[in-house]
Amino acid sequence: MIKSYLGIDIGSISTKGVIIDENNNILASSYLWTKGNPINAVKEVINELHNKIKGKAIKIVSVGTTGSARKLIGTILNASIIKNE
């Protein structure tokens, strides 16, 4: 099982997500428009990331959020890090 970390940047214009391993290698990434709805944008980013890692032995051990909706999404995802840019 590969220990990995999920990072999400939820901005007013775009939402970006990345999954990295312990050596900072990017395992999957996603970039979508927020379209004024950060919750739906994050759902789409997570679905896209999930599809990219499907079938791989990856375990997300920590989540971090940043961006204008960092507190909202960080609370929803129970993020260990909610960081202002």
Locations of regions flagged by a protein language model:
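Short glycine-rich, Thr/Ser-proximal phosphate-binding strand/loop in the N-terminal lobe
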Residues: 5-40, 44
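Hydrophobic alpha-helical segments
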Residues: 23-25, 47, 75, 80-81
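Short beta-strand-loop/turn "lid" adjacent to the catalytic site in phosphate-handling enzymes
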Residues: 30-34, 53-85
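Stable alpha-helical structural segments in soluble proteins, enriched in small hydrophobic residues
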Residues: 45-53
